[in-house]
Amino acid sequence: MKKSIICILLIFALVLSGCSSSDDEKDNTGTPATESVDTVDNETKQETNTPVKDDTDTGAQTTVADKKTGFSLSVSGSDKKLKISRAANAGKSMGDDGVWTIFVYLCGTDLESSGQGSATSDVAQMLESEGSDNVRFVIQTGGTSEWENEMFTVGKAERYVVQNGDINLVDSVELTNMGDAETLASFLKWGVSNYASEKMGLVFWDHGGGSITGVCVDELFNCDTLYLSEINSALSSVFSDMTDKFEFIGFDCCLMGTAETANVLTTYARYMYGSQETEPGSGWNYTAISDYLVSNPSANGAELGKVVADSFYDECKECEQENECTLTIVDLSKFDEFLVEFNDYASRLYEACQNSDALGAIVRCIDKAENFGGNNKSEGYTNMVDIGGIVNACADYADPGNVLTALKGCISYNKNGSNHKKASGLSIYYPLQVQGSNELKVFSGIAISPYYISIADMVANGYTDNGYSNEVFFTDDGDWSNDDCENDYFDDDYFDYADEEEYGGESSLITFEEEPYVDENGMYCFKLDENGLDWAVSVSAEIALDYDGETFVILGETADVNGDWETGEFYDNFDGYWYSLPDGTLLSAYVVDYSEDGERAIYTSPVVVNGESTNLRFWVGGSGDIHIEGTWDGIDENGMAAREIKKLQDGDVIVPVYYLEDDSEFEGSEYEWEEGDELTYSYLPEGDYYYSFYVDDAYGDYYSSDYVVFSIDENGEIIFSGDGSMGLDGDYAYGDYGYDDYDYDDYDDEEYYY
């Protein structure tokens, strides 16, 4: 069944001439792991998994026959300690010494059908590597409506072996859903039966969305994806046919370097490879991987992992996208020690959160931790937050204990770009902005601690002085088990409150000693009272303009707000500067992240480029220098992160997009990008503008102040007019601004300069 590879190599040569990616640099080598405590009861435990996926949330309804799980987590109410039980096998090699087989679950999706050819390029890299009888890639194809090569067939699930610079079609089966556990299980059962070796790896190749939405979007089956629970079920079913673990399981996709993922894989593999941040379309360097194994057939997962991470970083750097790069190699033999320590830590943090006076401050601390995959209005939310960042940020409220030591101990190696210098190596779900009840249901089934579930529930549900109880997650005896959460031990409707949340800019938790006003020095300012300080987590400002007397256009967000979190006093620090295209066309800009030292701020701007909606990413250095990263499509409706950050090209037509008062969109004037163009940061044009404070509360709602009018004159001076009241209620940040009812004569004549 061998096919000629001449044509496919020609296609490969074409796609390899392109380069696409998404990220940054910094070599951050993890410390050696310490010896783990004996927390594992090596007995097989197989139970039913999480509920079937609902098509309203995932795009398809999937049933997985004979669902299984290879581990159990439990906490006793008597001591609150986490106990772990994992399935085990004989630990006996399944093939000849010095032979490596890497199984690749190649779900092409739009990374192929859009003409990008990313999967095709990676298979080309496998073919270009040094030949050896001791290294082979075994591939299953699917998930895309079109391949960028003439070898793979769209209407079939095909299985190929790449070895010694050749590719052979060895099996072709009925096309099935790559987002279904049964498809993965079938491939792996067939694979380990026919291509077992001393060391075996598994790579998930496609889009990823983090712990909640999982990996591998099958665009032929309603964009269904593999949840972590389904990966667990598939791996458990094949594990019973194996006498040894996979040497590694890795994700050549975005955002899967998470604690929830590592917990699932610990039963089945020795190492996990995953990125906390988004990955570029070019992904891993399979030539480097294969060449290393050809020369080092006895290498273990840690040694290979370092090569994977370093060569991945180099791939990103070649395309000038190394800044966002992250890749972590986790020693899963040490991971259970981390789980035990994390549960202890989560218990302490949960106790601290029950003090309503401290909860707002804790959430404010977590807000400052690094997060990954957008997490803003323009790009969407993944709710993936750095574990080390959470622990360090909350150190004043909960003793870290040994959790950071255990975390470092299980990180064999990681490679971080300059935008993620402090990333600890693993993320965890945290409800920065909940997208609905299904998100919380999925999380409860994969969570690694009942106390951490309780914290997430407390934040998502808006706990205040009315009291909070986490009894719903425990039995009458005070015990907890992940089996109970997976099997809907508690009411399946419990999280429905997340579908009823409405955020309208009138948070009752944000209260003032002095409400926003313009003071005698021309500063727009306010002072929170004690209650407001307890619940406020961040303060920013929104800038808007009246486009044509009828259209109220929001320019975006600025973090230029001065404040004191001890006294509750805040005042504007807006200097009148804004970002624009080279011809002066203003961009709508929103803050993605900024460094604590003020040396770097990352922004995103919604735009249309060549007719396609996307986001323009750029960062600003401490001296005001602007660096364009490129365009990124953000998080799609399936919760998957786009893999590419595309560089702007000469001739690209850019149209800025702005949000209006009702959250609809308004397009500005188009601009044709020329090579050598740069964004500008200069005074806003002479005219009238509007300024409003945004104060976020601990639960995702916010308070928006009345807009005040400020003018910029021909000299660039900022003038606030009136007493700070436009006569617009805070509701109108996302409502009807009532221009017809507005009378400019209502303002006092006094003007303020600064």
Give names to the regions the model predicted.
Residues 59-196:
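N-terminal extension/subdomain marker
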Residues 141-243, 253-254, 259, 276-277:
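Catalytic-core segments of thiol-dependent peptidases
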Residues 26-63:
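N-terminal, intrinsically disordered, polar/charged segments of Gram-positive cell-envelope systems
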Residues 54-95, 210-211, 215-251, 256-744, ...:
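Terminal, contiguous helix-loop blocks that mediate binding/assembly
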Residues 16-18:
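C-terminal motif of bacterial Sec signal peptides marking the signal peptidase cleavage site
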Residues 101-106, 136-141, 200-204, 247-251, ...:
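Structural recognition of the beta-strand scaffold that forms the well-ordered cores
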